[in-house]
């Protein structure tokens, strides 16, 4: 093998005339009787290795490419070893594709230019006109007829190296191509470096949810995404990922509108149902620089951490139409008008929301802006007549009985719903609250017969008041009587009588009421439509548990907003994938699908041939049956990245 060395060349900028140095890895090769210097790899302008270490770096690379050429391992500093491993991996990844090796051999066309071997080259890629980076999302053309490549190798010399995950990345790129995200980012004037970093952030959140710093490490050491995009993430600073988040936040409204428009076109969605709800997530640290980070009621029981609130407007299919970040202690009812203003929903669109948001002021606003609404009624008296009800079934097979009652003004109706499962739950709650309240009353009674206990009328009334305050509504069902002594200053006896208040949880367990101005639907259609609101809960579970919404590690409001928005975009991609898979009978959660996809790896196998040369083969592992089923359902290649061969 011809020895390699590093050449430094001075180049002048054609526009400014400014001079600068570029670095290339070259080797000597005899052509037509003359020795020519052949560029093996462009190392860019900002090559970080000192000149004194160039020979050591080249020797280590030669050893990695042809292990038999050096009998003992070289003692290299850590930064030299990392650089050698990185550049050797690039040489193998950029080797010519094997004919007939796979339909996706060239699917990883660079989003950032033809050659992104270094950070400097990546910095220049926005000057290169690019096509679709992935090629995923379209059925791959048939591969050419496979040709045999028979070679004699030493079996004992076989080594595997550079294992990287590729399955999740491949499917995520399919979703990104379906949504046309790269074209949209290009249209918005975002250069190739930032496009690559935005995709790195997004796919990292889909495949291995973590902070930007952890994602940067994942892109370099665990993922083959760089190969699919032809981007050298090892040549990029981790700060690029943070800046990519900032740039993406600057285009939030345009990106949300584009993504929802894309899924509407792909799946033929009808914009007739709008779901709205909020959730919150907690911060790591005090986040003193973020005004939105406030202490409040944490849905994860993290009252020790400041919170931020995420509001989502979704359509009936579970895709996000709009998202916005609010303060952690925001009142739910105060957010609706902010989210729906300017939404440009179709006339008569139906808004569904729970009781926390369905204030009378919000209902009046919906009526004023000609929305239809289907909401959970806040408060009010419970009522239900089983004889006037009809039955329906939930997806879980539970029976729910429905009674429709027209309002006095004829403009709104109430749908009273009775659930057997909810009845059992509420009966247990009422029993527990009443038992605790009666135990508190009995404790007061026991104290009246003991010496040195407080028996004054005023103090006993205060104790009863505190007991009522903690009773969670159970006290309303009790009539309490205090019998004072003749002096009127102390209590002689205390008694109580339990009488259920009609129209309450105790008298009508399992009953809740929906209110709507949709008057021409039957009971079953109204309830089944309202039941789609439970889809938001599954969305929030996916965002938090599967896509890394919590916790938030950032301290400034802009970075927190960026973290949440990237998570929402990741959810859109996952929802697209799951929607396509459901149409083919695959309905697993994303956590389950991700485990199946993560099994597939891309590795380099090196072996010594009979002629003394070393053969390096970069190839993706064969898809297992469960994974193959996913690829076939999505219509994408089962061998992303193809096969690359390099003989040294």
Where are the model-predicted features located?
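Extended interaction-bearing regions that mediate binding to partners or small molecules
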Residues: 1-82, 86, 97, 101, ...
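Anion-binding and metal-coordination hotspots
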Residues: 3-6, 15, 21-24, 98-139, ...
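Glycine-rich, N-terminal phosphate-binding loop and its surrounding beta-alpha-beta segment
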Residues: 57-102, 112, 123, 129-131, ...
